[in-house]
Design a protein with these regions (language model features):
Chain B
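Extracytoplasmic/periplasmic substrate-recognition and gating elements
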Residues: 19, 46-47, 211, 219-228, ...
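A structural signal for short loop-to-beta-strand junctions that line the ligand-binding cleft
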Residues: 78, 106-140, 173-174, 276-282, ...
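Extracytoplasmic/periplasmic solute-binding protein
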Residues: 124-134, 152-203, 245
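Glycine-centered hinge/linker elements that transmit conformational signals in sensory
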Residues: 156-158, 200-230
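Conserved C-terminal helix/tail region of periplasmic/extracytoplasmic solute-binding proteins
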Residues: 222, 353-426
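A structural signal for multi-pass alpha-helical bundles of membrane permease subunits
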Residues: 448-732
Length: 272, 732
């Protein structure tokens, strides 16, 4: 009984811990003009207003940023899932020269401080005339998330019994058909996770986008939000309102697939 | 035929018309100014129908680094607008053009000399306004007359610092300002007797004047208690706007804000220092337009120059003066009634009289940085004012030397080139069989696998592997401020420097602590919560979704939110500590240990959901029969955890923890955003944030690349070791 009570207390504590910052952002976004500074802990104070949300949509280019972000994240997610699922399948099912080397080098790509790749990125992209174009971002975003996604997918494929494919091979299926008709459908938890990671890496990325996209017509949500923060006078209300709206799609995504998340992230390592 | 010709000509002219010249301007104007800019640009486009102007806002630091990389890549905006102190670095790098060639020498005579600064004898920018200087702004309701000297400042400050309801908390402050930032503190230094920069370039920091200034601020904070213990720009601004501060030190850019908040304010010089009889000298600068060296065509250049002349012309400046109250740089504009009849601008001009021009040489950046580091250490109590002043001089000289260093290729360069050649040849020789096998693989039985992998690996190669090798090359080069355009391989110097610097080892130690503490909490909290959710809680899905939230919110939003929550005065964390736990408030962000702790708390918040999900997955794959059997054998719950859960969870948690450690080790976002790039005094850095600062703030690209290669090697060696020991355990 005592144990049960302790469990409840600690889970409630952590629920507060994980929710509070969000509540705080909500409360800031609801405050009127002057700002995030108040010494009360009220979430919805007497002066609360939805003004910030209204002006976010009417006075800023928020909808444009939203559209750009959706395009970029959509393409990145699609490309990321396609690339990761194919190459991970090869790494899982085939034994060939350099396979271990490849797996290890995928892991090592995570070890280099990513910010230092900025300078070379920029030089390469400007030589290819990909500055101020979504193509540059498509390429960078879908590739940077790849190493983790490939590892993830491979671990999952490893748990799928080979017998499934062998039967189909005997029936005369091509390898490509086996992959698309048998393997992909049973890998949905892992595919969902790969999609999630690809999506997240582009949805909230800021540093690279800031360099690649120079035309405000092409701004993504993080870039747009950042423009509310002048060096010395941040429009906290607008920023908070925008931050909330940026987080909501990811939140919904996470919550709706949290079931897949559990099996997708761990299946491989448990049985593999 | 004629008809077709006509059509052709019309089409051509339409096409020509459709192809308007597009001129880009990057600027860092604050919100109110941006609106005026938009208006005047609209007017310009009306006057010049063949030109469209694209104005892009960038935050000051970002404008600087973004412009640097853009110009280096041969592109970038035609015009760049910013404070005069960016002229020095940009001109040194050779990425902005001397304006004398395009505008003629006499053009500059129409401006206030402050607005047309020269660097190496040439003009690189024209300012559209003069000012940017600090002054004392006072709330007339709380303080009818401003103090004239520092004694009065302290007296009046004491009177205006009030705890209204007697709860031990000050409700109204005598003076507020962003005093941890050297820019806001610099005006006092000359008032105590000595400038902090000599001959425009040399740091002059080891002076009694600097030590006394340190002491003066400390006294205001600790002895007279008229300024808050912790006060950043936002806090000072908010207190003043809420009528909770009698006096404020801020610049001319802030007036609009206070007018809008309906504060009845007056402005005055920062009070004279009574002991010396000298006035604090604010740094007076200009913000202006510079011309990119890279132009797409002569037409672009012509249009950009036209735009530049328009934006600095009298009517445009007057429009700015009228709407946002800036002091025009154009001498004609300054004579107009709009300026003359504006009381604020008049006082402002008077304050500027005791001001000093803002130095624009690149070295200033190193001086500011050293000053900031030492000053914040003094404020945190880890250095005495004297030691702080002494240390600032040493540090500034060191940083200037590093920044200006142009390494010459030494013997190492030849060794290096030889090694590179050998590695490449050796690599080809060693892998020749693999290469052949690889090429043949496209026809062999495994060709399906090859085609499946090819697209992903092309992507990874282009985006990660190639830039990575590029970086290795930079790490052996002299790429820095003075060799921005043409760098060359020089040898091992950066590596030798990195390893012989004691700072490297202390940073490494701190990074290890950061990683271990974070990953420890991530894993233990993750497993703890997973066990509870899995065994005790009803509605598992609900709790799981609830606790996943921190993971779902984009990191940069999280980090800034937590920074606001740690605010000493307004952050909910301190308010809870005081109101409910009756503890004294913690100065989270101005003490090195608490600031580091704040970063860790933020990162723990960010990271535990991932581990929890992984642990949940692991737990759910453990068969229930094991627990039932154990229960039958009479095992306690601890024994069940110790002998069933833990060992079966290990294979899941170890790889996750491994990956988690790598991510944490390289996590720049949290440290950078929560501690505001390493504050206080550069004492919250971990290796990656230190690298970032060296590269993008201090122009030491080569050195930064070398340290990042070292970070990589550390992680690879450690990762290999972990994998190996794990492998051995599994095969036992």
């Amino acid at each position: 009984m005592v144990k049960r009570l302790l469990a409840w207390v600690s889970i409630l504590l952590f629920a507060v811990f994980s929710l509070y910052p969000i509540v705080y952002v909500i409360s800031v976004s609801l405050r009127g003009d002057n700002a995030f500074q108040t010494q009360s802990l009220e979430i919805v104070g007497p002066n609360s207003t939805l003004k910030n949300f209204v002006s976010l949509f009417t006075e800023t280019d928020f909808l444009l940023w939203l559209k750009n972000s959706l395009i970029i994240s959509g393409v990145t997610t699609f490309a990321g899932v396609a690339l990761a699922s194919c190459s991970a399948y090869a790494l899982s099912r085939y034994r060939f020269r350099g396979r271990n080397m490849m797996l290890f080098s995928l892991l090592t790509t995570q070890m280099f401080p990513a910010t230092m790749l900025m300078l070379p990125f920029f030089i390469i992209l400007s030589q290819l005339h990909l500055i101020d174009s979504f193509w540059g971002l498509f390429i960078i975003y879908s590739s940077t998330a790849l190493p983790f996604c490939i590892w993830q997918m491979k671990a999952y494929y490893d748990t799928i019994p080979r017998e499934l494919e062998e039967a189909a091979l005997l029936d005369g299926c091509s390898r490509w058909m086996i992959f698309t008709k048998i393997i992909l459908p049973v890998s949905s938890p892992a595919l969902v996770i790969t999609a999630l990671f690809s999506f997240m890496s582009s949805w909230s990325e800021y540093v690279i986008a800031a360099v690649v996209l120079q035309d405000p017509q092409l701004y993504t949500l993080p870039l747009g939000l950042r423009s509310f923060q002048a060096s010395l006078a941040t429009q906290w209300g607008l920023y908070a309102a925008g931050a909330l709206i940026v987080s909501i799609p990811v939140l919904i995504l996470f919550i709706s697939i949290s079931r897949y998340l559990v099996s997708g992230l761990t299946m491989g390592s448990v049985k593999g | 035929m004629r008809y077709y010709l006509f059509l052709l000509i019309t089409l051509c002219s339409m096409a020509a018309h459709a192809e308007k010249l597009r001129i880009h301007v990057w600027h860092q104007m604050i919100y109110g100014h941006r609106q005026v800019l938009a208006e005047v640009l609209k007017e310009f486009e009306k006057q010049n129908p063949d030109i469209t102007v694209q104005a892009t806002y960038r935050e000051t630091e970002e404008l600087r680094s973004g412009y640097q990389s853009a110009a280096m890549g041969g592109s970038g905006p035609e015009l760049v607008y910013g404070p005069s102190d960016q002229i020095g670095p940009f001109a040194t790098m050779g990425i902005i053009r001397p304006l004398d060639e395009v505008l003629g020498v006499d053009y500059f005579k129409q401006f206030d000399p402050l607005a047309a600064p020269t660097f190496n004898g040439k003009h690189f920018a024209i300012g559209d306004a003069v000012g940017n200087h600090l002054m004392l702004i006072y709330n007339k309701k709380l303080l009818p007359v401003p103090p004239k000297n520092s004694d009065e400042l302290i007296e009046m400050g004491k009177k205006a610092t009030i705890d209204k309801n007697g709860d031990g908390r000050v409700d109204q402050w005598g003076l507020v300002f962003n005093y941890t930032e050297p820019f806001f503190f610099a005006p006092f230094i000359p008032a105590f007797g000595d400038d902090f920069i000599k001959d425009d370039v040399k740091p002059n920091l080891n002076t009694p004047a600097l030590a006394n200034t340190f002491q003066f601020i400390l006294d205001m904070r600790d002895k007279y208690k008229i300024i808050p213990k912790e006060c950043d720009y936002e806090t000072a601004n908010a207190l003043f706007k809420d009528n909770k501060a009698a006096m404020l030190i801020n610049g001319d850019w802030s007036w609009g804000d206070y007018k809008e908040a309906k504060v009845d304010f007056g402005i005055a010089r920062i009070p004279m220092i009574s002991g010396t009889g000298k006035w604090p000298a604010s740094l007076v600068g200009t913000k202006g337009y510079s011309l990119n060296v890279n132009m797409k065509s002569p037409q672009h250049q012509e249009a950009a120059v036209k735009l530049l002349m328009y934006l600095t012309s009298t009517p445009v400046q007057l429009q700015f003066a009228e709407k946002v109250g800036i002091l025009p740089s154009n001498l004609d504009a300054r004579d107009s009634d709009i300026v003359k009849n504006n009381p604020l601008l008049k006082i402002s001009a008077d304050i500027m009289e005791v001001g000093h021009p803002m130095p624009i040489v690149p070295e200033v950046r190193a001086i500011w940085d050293s000053l900031r580091i030492q000053y914040q250490k003094v404020l945190a109590g880890s250095l005495t004012p004297q030691a702080g002043a002494q240390g600032a001089q040493v540090l500034a000289e060191k940083q200037i030397a590093e920044m200006n260093e142009v390494l010459k290729p030494d013997a190492g360069a030849y060794v290096l080139k030889a090694i590179f050649a050998l590695v490449i040849l050796g690599g080809i020789w060693m892998s020749r069989k693999s290469l052949v096998a690889f090429v043949k693989g496209f026809q062999g039985p495994n060709r399906f696998a090859y085609y499946m992998m090819l697209p992903a690996f092309i992507g990874i190669f282009a985006v990660i592997v190639y830039p990575f090798f590029y970086n290795i090359a930079i790490s052996f080069s002299n790429f820095s401020l003075r060799t921005f355009q043409d760098w060359s391989l020089v040898g091992f110097t950066h590596y030798v420097n990195a390893f012989s610097d004691p700072k490297f080892y202390s940073l490494f130690l701190k990074t290890v602590i950061w990683t271990v503490v974070n990953v420890f909490f991530h894993v233990t909290l993750g497993v703890f919560l997973a066990v509870i959710i899995n065994q005790v809680m009803p509605f598992q899905g609900f709790w799981r979704a609830l606790l996943i939230i921190p993971w779902a919110v984009p990191q940069y939003i999280t980090a800034l939110t937590w920074r606001a929550m740690f605010n000493q005065e307004y952050g909910p964390i301190n308010i809870v500590l005081q109101k409910f736990l009756h503890l004294s408030p913690i100065q989270w962000l101005s003490q090195p240990t608490t600031a580091f702790a704040a970063c860790i708390i933020t990162n723990v918040w960010l990271g535990f959901p991932f581990m929890m999900i992984v642990a949940l997955g692991g737990l759910q794959s453990i068969s229930h029969s094991l627990y039932e059997a154990a229960r039958l054998d009479g095992a306690t719950s601890w024994q069940r955890f110790r002998h069933i859960t833990w060992p079966l969870l290990m294979p899941v948690m170890v790889p996750a923890a491994l990956l988690g450690s790598i991510w944490t080790f390289n996590n720049l976002n949290v440290i950078w955003l929560v501690s505001n790039s390493g504050e206080p005094g550069d004492q919250t850095h971990i290796l990656v944030s230190y690298v970032y600062k060296a590269a993008f703030n201090l122009y030491r690209y080569g050195y930064a690349a070398a340290v990042s290669v070292i970070i990589f090697l550390i992680l690879v060696i450690w990762g290999l070791g972990m994998l190996k020991s794990q492998y051995q355990k599994e095969t036992k």
